[in-house]
Regions:
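Feature for exported/extracytoplasmic and membrane-associated proteins, marking the mature portion
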Residues: 1-114, 134, 148-201
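Glycine-rich and small/hydrophobic secondary-structure elements
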Residues: 145
């Protein structure tokens, strides 16, 4: 059936058809890379959703796909309650989430560093918001304005950039927020884009 020309309906329908065709093309490319000779994982990964995502990324890269940026996700950090199990107890939901993050990233880094693909890979964490610097009444923390970032990979010079936050900055007058930003996340992204991926200014 032909698509009507010179009409809003026809334009929108053509967009849907083109999008469908592009999705099929991209799906074929992903499938080919995932199933390519040599597209394997060289280490074992934990049995978690985040680890499965990173495991797939490593396999796609080893399979020769040319994608420059991948995004994987882990949910559950909006810890308004049960962030820990009680006063003075560090165990709880936040500890479990950090364990999932660290073990998945550890496996991914070990995998990509098992051969030369790790020479060209940098990973970093980001979130849509941070947490306040005070516990609420439900053993959790509410939305805050700053948060740490983890940057990892063989090209990264390891260490801590910045200094410990000044917790005295968080008071009832500013709703227990830490306001001093040491590294703007946009600048971190820009640095990686320019210095590592070769993007222009």
């Amino acid at each position: 059936q032909s698509i009507p020309q010179n009409s809003h309906y026809g334009t929108e329908l053509q967009y849907v058809v083109d999008t469908d065709a592009s999705a099929n093309t991209y799906a074929k490319s992903i499938q080919d890379s995932f199933n390519a000779v040599g597209a394997t994982n060289l280490v074992s990964y934990p049995d978690t959703d985040l680890a499965d995502q990173l495991k797939t990324v490593a396999r796609l890269i080893r399979g020769g796909i040319q994608t420059k940026v991948y995004m994987v996700t882990i949910g559950g950090f909006d810890t308004h309650n049960a962030q820990n199990q009680g006063s003075g107890d560090i165990n709880g939901r936040h500890t479990d989430l950090m364990n999932q993050l660290s073990t998945a990233v550890d496996a991914f880094v070990a995998d990509i560093n098992s051969d030369t693909i790790g020479d060209d890979i940098i990973g970093l964490t980001f979130s849509e918001f941070g947490r306040k610097a005070i516990q609420n009444g439900n053993y959790g923390t509410d939305h805050g304005e700053i948060a740490p970032m983890f940057v990892f990979g063989k090209p990264v010079e390891g260490g801590i950039s910045g200094v410990n936050v000044d917790l005295t900055e968080a008071t009832s007058n500013n709703n227990w927020q830490l306001k001093t930003v040491q590294h703007d996340y946009r600048q971190v992204f820009a640095t990686l884009m320019q210095d590592f991926l070769g993007a222009s200014d």
